[in-house]
Amino acid sequence: MPFRSNNPITRDELLSRFFPQFHPVTTFNSGLSGGSFLIEHQGQRFVVRQPHDPDAPRFAFLRQYRALSQLPACIAPKPHLYLRDWMVVDYLPGEVKTYLPDTNELAGLLYYLHQQPRFGWRITLLPLLELYWQQSDPARRTVGWLRRLKRLRKAREPRPLRLSPLHMDVHAGNLVHSASGLKLIDWEYAGDGDIALELAAVWVENTDQHRQLVNDYATRAKIYPAQLWRQVRRWFPWLLMLKAGWFEYRWRQTGDQQFIRLADDTWRQLLIKQ
């Protein structure tokens, strides 16, 4: 249920107006982007979310609601309310583990997602790369960073192998192991893009695991594994730059030292993969 209002409301106003019988249970602070909180009434639970990035355009949060509204409940939480700066979605019972599931199981989930109707908006990385450069700490901007940005701008993004709806933040902390199977949470980066971009963006433990995931996906999608892996590799420079830039951007926003450490580690990976 989208509810349009130009006036922001507080958490207490949200609960008293729309969920008067519910009460807060706990706050989630997992992940790098921020937290949300859980409300409950007689065993029914919802997750109340706010935009992770306070500087992001408002349409980005609305897009997340629209994506969840069209996705099947077997892979994503169902949304119940959207209004300015707030979204309420189903709580997904299950276990969130610290490691990825079996690659074949994960490949099945991603392949099923990629068979769904497209969302209607494209994921384009170059505008994000340029935004992160512009919004980063000037003291952290380097000639090497600018050189890589110009190189990618000149090269342009790889031509999509197959265009599908993507989640774009697949890691262990965003996967719920439920009784009915794997489900994905945190859809704030969702959009339409190349299936190989999704596979390239999965937070894997090592190259062997990555290759196996791509091979398992290729089998389901009836694509030659070597062809799919080549396309995945084409996205690596873009994704490493995206991660490094995002960490730099979040460092300037929050001052949290973890983002500097993650940014430095990603810059080292870029040097290794040159």
UniProtKB/Swiss-Prot annotation:
Keyword Nucleotide-binding assigned: yes
GO BP term, pick one: thiamine metabolic process
Catalytic activity: thiamine + ATP = thiamine phosphate + ADP + H(+)
Region forming the signal peptide: none
Keyword Nucleotide-binding: yes
Its EC number(s): 2.7.1.89
Domain of life: Bacteria
GO molecular function, one term: ATP binding
Top EC class of this enzyme: transferase
Pathway(s) of this molecule: Cofactor biosynthesis; thiamine diphosphate biosynthesis; thiamine phosphate from thiamine: step 1/1
Matching Gene3D superfamilies: 3.90.1200.10
UniProt keyword terms in alphabetical order: ATP-binding, Kinase, Nucleotide-binding, Transferase
Function, in words: Catalyzes the ATP-dependent phosphorylation of thiamine to thiamine phosphate. Is involved in thiamine salvage.
Family statement: Belongs to the thiamine kinase family.
Protein known as: Thiamine kinase
Organism of this sequence: Escherichia coli O127:H6 (strain E2348/69 / EPEC)
Gene: thiK
